[in-house]
Swiss-Prot record:
Stated consequence of mutating residue 439 to A: No loss of activity
A Pfam family this chain is assigned to: AceK_kinase
Protein name: Isocitrate dehydrogenase kinase/phosphatase
One MF term in the entry's GO annotations: manganese ion binding
Enzyme Commission code(s) on record: 2.7.11.5, 3.1.3.-
Amino acid sequence: MPRGLELLIAQTILQGFDAQYGRFLEVTSGAQQRFEQADWHAVQQAMKNRIHLYDHHVGLVVEQLRCITNGQSTDAAFLLRVKEHYTRLLPDYPRFEIAESFFNSVYCRLFDHRSLTPERLFIFSSQPERRFRTIPRPLAKDFHPDHGWESLLMRVISDLPLRLRWQNKSRDIHYIIRHLTETLGTDNLAESHLQVANELFYRNKAAWLVGKLITPSGTLPFLLPIHQTDDGELFIDTCLTTTAEASIVFGFARSYFMVYAPLPAALVEWLREILPGKTTAELYMAIGCQKHAKTESYREYLVYLQGCNEQFIEAPGIRGMVMLVFTLPGFDRVFKVIKDRFAPQKEMSAAHVRACYQLVKEHDRVGRMADTQEFENFVLEKRHISPALMELLLQEAAEKITDLGEQIVIRHLYIERRMVPLNIWLEQVEGQQLRDAIEEYGNAIRQLAAANIFPGDMLFKNFGVTRHGRVVFYDYDEICYMTEVNFRDIPPPRYPEDELASEPWYSVSPGDVFPEEFRHWLCADPRIGPLFEEMHADLFRADYWRALQNRIREGHVEDVYAYRRRQRFSVRYGEMLF
């Protein structure tokens, strides 16, 4: 290779990332217009398009590099020099951290995810931790109650870029003040002030004002979801001021926000204070930088592994028929490998399973489906693997494993947030906790269905419980669109003997689902059955599901709330007039 080519390649990769992030910001900047036009289908399509941008631009850069090198192979020394040149381009680059991830992605695409060593990749960042450039303008603006909180909130709302009319601005302001007074007390509220992000956070059918409520005793989140009435008028649906509520809003089971962030590292740092339980990976994920979030997630895994004496074990719960799931006992993630062969009743291919996981990545997860990161050629030290798990891996996924002596390489796996399997949770709880879990499960099914997702296998073992008590779906191999399912009533038996027969007395075609049958496996436990019948009996009726299908086919997009119905102002305070 001619000398000087290394710098050209490094510059080409960085220019490719510039193009990718420019398009990322372009799609993001259209969020306000889509919201104001109430074009919810465009919102969903923009979300998918933005997810695809990264891989598309990686592919473009790879083709450019193959042209530059005339398809010639490159030796290790050449690649190291390319990385050295690339590193020298980063000290004055504003998005250095994601640029490093982009370099990694290009390298992996060029070399088929092989030879992934720290010398060749940015396994850890080359730049000082939390290094920032001069920010062209502040990320947030401070508002002080010099003339009272009503005046302060009027200024906050008047500062918003939204061009639609407000349904009743005074009412919403008084709702917020009432909530803040109940939360802080009059005296503390008088001594508090707000810091509000300059950019709105758009997701689904809401525009979120994200801020910090700075009180004498500390800083709290200040989140206002702004919605539209059917007449296109704006209203504030609630005010959230706890870290637990904020954590759910920015949760791993939700779609990524669209927030204009030319300097994502600075925004992530600003968010840390109100989301103390979120890792760096989770914060990048929340603002849509999902590929860099994957890098940060891998770094978090490596740091944990270096500091623990644990071995990987099979994850607790009922063993799956499609996926082999393992974890580190103290780590908050699970690792999922597609088995070489599935149980006989699972008539599907590995390609189908991967397509289901990609569907979830691109779809609106409505807070009810866990996000995943996909890895290829994942290296594990044998000393970190328990003997029982090693035996299981070789038994169930040998075709995906390469033995390197002291290491194994798993050709493909997913990493996902670890949760308590719902079936285990239900065995351990009683009283109100049991009731809450059943309510959550039914709500999860309803919200998934309203978002055009049918889980397929609705057994409790396929759902998990988060640390906030939310029920989230995580087994995707039978997932499909609601509109692909034929929901049927079971025909009445022709003769009394029909009900005793081993075979059904009616025909069953692929895609047929009989909701009446759900009762058999969801209500078998006498502690659970009465609760289910009380709260979710309509899930056992085919007409309920068909009505949802009709709404979806008519183009209706349901509202998705990242908080309980009882937290909505309209429920808490009613239509109070001001």
